[in-house]
A protein has these predicted regions:
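Beta-rich, aromatic/charged-enriched effector core domains that present basic-aromatic interfaces
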Residues: 3-148
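Catalytic cores of enzymes that engage adenine nucleotides and/or redox cofactors via long glycine-rich
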Residues: 104-200
Length: 200
């Protein structure tokens, strides 16, 4: 419990009367941290995580409001209305439809040019971390031999810009397309860096 011990020392040394922290999205660490707070009887406040457009409470209330089958489409509609995303002044979807899924299933033309994902420039920053991963997590699945995604905010934002500049215009048409020799096609592949909070 090295982290907890050090954190508690800082709290006592700085005479901190209350700690405030964002919701912890790693469930294992959240449980561990909550236990640390409870055992040490720390005055604390949990703040909604800015990585998400909705709070946990809001999503929980949505789930409780669903009497039968839970449909994520209903949740997306609710959030679009709340945040006025592609919504007209009558609180209806722009274009008259909530979903255009049928337009996402076009067949990928044989001669279409597929933009490559941007090469990663920050591999040097990853080298020391790679050594630690290989040392402490050597028996875990996966490999550190090839780093294909950004690990810092600067490159993550460049990655996002690249998606809008080179892929976004074709993303909708070929969202569900598959090609065996290409893993990403017109997808942004930003889910991992979104989940790490590098774009938030």
């Amino acid at each position: 419990d090295i982290f907890e011990d050090k954190f508690l020392k800082v709290i006592k040394k700085e005479d901190i009367s209350k700690i405030k922290y964002f919701e912890i999205e790693d469930h294992f660490f959240e449980k561990r941290f909550n236990n640390f707070v409870l055992v040490n009887k720390l005055n604390h406040e949990t703040i909604n995580n800015p990585m998400f457009l909705t709070s946990r409470l809001e999503f929980k209330e949505f789930l409780q409001s669903q009497k039968k089958l839970i449909r994520m489409a209903s949740f997306y509609q609710k959030i679009r209305q709340k945040l006025s995303i592609l919504i007209d002044d009558q609180n209806k979807p722009l274009g008259g439809k909530w979903s255009y899924d049928e337009d996402n299933r076009k067949k990928l033309p044989k001669n279409i040019d597929i933009p490559k994902i941007p090469p990663i420039q920050n591999d040097n920053k990853f080298k020391s971390l790679k050594l630690k991963i290989n040392s402490f997590f050597y028996d875990h699945p996966g490999s550190t031999d090839y780093l294909w995604m950004p690990t810092d905010r600067e490159e993550s934002l460049m990655w996002l810009d690249n998606f809008f500049e080179n892929k976004f215009s074709n993303f909708g048409n070929y969202e569900d397309a598959i090609r065996s020799e290409n893993n990403f096609l017109f997808h942004s592949a930003i889910s991992p860096i979104l989940n790490m909070g590098l774009i938030t």
